[in-house]
Regions:
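Internal alpha-helical scaffold of NAD(P)-dependent oxidoreductase catalytic cores
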Residues: 134-220
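Interdomain hinge/lid region at the active-site interface
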Residues: 207-275
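Residues at the starts of beta-strands that form the adenosine-phosphate
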Residues: 3, 28, 114, 141, ...
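NAD(P)+-binding Rossmann beta1-loop-alpha1 motif at the extreme N-terminus of oxidoreductases
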Residues: 1-60
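Rossmann-like NAD(P)(H) cofactor-binding subdomain of soluble oxidoreductases
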Residues: 77-130
Length: 298
C-alpha cells in the first residue's frame, strides 16, 4: 500500500499509526483529527505521519482509509468524503458493532467503493494518542466482516494488512459478530457501568464511605467502567437487540443465583461456581490473558 488515511487519532488510531510506521506498511500515512487537543498531543509526541487539514486532502490520495472514530460519526464523514474517494480505495473501520454500520454503508457510501468492516479486539479504559501503543494489536484477534458485495481479493488485501499489524484474523458475518460480542464484550461493560453506579447509589443512600474500601472486584469493574462514554453509548445503541437478549439471559441467571442463595442451595451454588471458574482457565489457555495475580498489572 502506498498511502493510508487514519480518520481519528485517539487510542487505537494512534496505535495503528505507530505500528504502520514501524512496519513500513505504507509509504505515506495521513492523519485526520478534528480535536485540537489531540492534534497538539500528536505534535508534542512527534508521532509519525502527516496531519491533513481536510478530509478531502487525505481521502483523495489514499489506497486505504481507516475509520477510528466513534460510530456515530461515520455517516457525516462518509457524506464528506464520498466524491473524493478514488474508485480502487478500500475503506475499513475498528468499530465494535457491525449490523448497524452495514446499514449506514449501504445507504450512504458511494456505489462501487468497497468498505470491509474490521474489529480488532484491543483497547483500554484510557483514551487519547498519548496512550497508544505500537504493539496494541499484537496477537489479538481481528474480526473481518464478510458481506455479499465484498470481493474476495479485497478481503485478502485487508487480511494481509491486519496480519502485518500483528493481529490474528478471522472472517465472519456481521450477525454472528454482533451476537458474540454482545456477550463477551458489550454485556460485561454494561454490568461494570451498572455495578459502579450501584456502589455510588448505595454510598449515597446509606451515607457510608464505601468507595474508599473498594476490594479487587469493584476496583477491576471500575477500570472497565472508566472506558470512553461516547464510544460505549454508540455500541449499546447500535447493538441494542443482541444486548437486550444478553441482559435478559443475565437477569435470568442472576435471579437463579438469588434464589439459590436465599434457599441456601449448597449443591446448586457450588456447581455454578465450579463451572464458571473453568472459564478463566480456558481464557488463559487460549492466550486471551495471562496467568498472573492482578491480571499482571503489578
Amino acid at each position: 500500500m502506498k498511502n493510508i488515511l487514519i480518520i481519528g487519532c485517539g487510542l487505537l488510531g494512534s496505535s495503528l499509526l505507530r505500528r504502520i510506521s514501524k512496519k513500513k506498511i505504507a509509504k505515506k500515512i495521513f492523519i485526520y483529527e478534528k480535536s485540537k487537543s489531540n492534534i497538539a498531543k500528536i505534535k508534542r509526541l512527534k508521532l509519525p505521519g502527516t496531519i491533513v487539514k481536510s478530509l478531502k486532502e487525505g481521502a483523495s490520495n489514499s489506497d486505504l482509509i481507516i475509520f477510528c472514530t466513534p460510530m456515530s460519526e461515520y455517516k457525516n464523514i462518509i457524506l464528506k468524503i464520498n466524491k473524493f474517494i478514488p474508485s480502487k480505495t478500500l475503506i475499513t473501520d475498528i468499530g465494535s458493532s457491525k449490523i448497524e454500520t452495514s446499514k449506514i454503508i449501504n445507504k450512504f457510501l458511494k456505489k462501487g467503493i468497497q468498505w470491509i468492516q474490521s474489529h480488532p479486539i484491543a483497547g483500554s479504559e484510557v483514551s487519547g494518542p498519548e496512550h497508544g501503543k505500537e504493539n496494541m494489536f499484537t496477537d489479538r484477534w481481528c474480526i473481518i466482516i464478510k458481506e455479499k458485495n465484498i470481493k474476495k481479493n479485497n478481503i485478502n488485501i485487508l487480511t494481509k494488512f491486519w496480519k502485518k499489524i500483528g493481529a490474528k484474523v478471522v472472517v465472519m458475518s456481521a450477525e454472528k459478530h454482533d451476537k458474540i460480542f454482545s456477550i463477551t464484550s458489550h454485556l460485561p461493560h454494561l454490568i461494570a457501568y451498572n455495578l459502579v453506579k450501584s456502589a455510588q447509589d448505595f454510598e449515597k443512600k446509606q451515607n457510608y464511605e464505601l468507595i474508599k474500601y473498594s476490594a479487587g472486584g469493584l476496583r477491576d469493574f471500575s477500570r472497565i467502567a472508566a472506558s470512553n462514554e461516547i464510544m460505549w453509548r454508540d455500541i449499546f445503541f447500535n447493538n441494542k437487540n443482541n444486548i437486550s437478549k444478553a441482559i435478559d439471559l443475565f437477569i435470568k441467571n442472576l435471579n437463579q443465583f438469588k434464589k439459590d442463595i436465599n434457599s441456601k442451595n449448597n449443591k446448586s451454588i457450588v456447581k455454578k461456581l465450579t463451572q464458571t471458574k473453568k472459564v478463566r482457565s480456558k481464557i488463559i489457555k487460549l492466550k486471551q490473558d495471562i496467568d498472573k495475580p492482578d491480571f499482571g498489572r503489578n
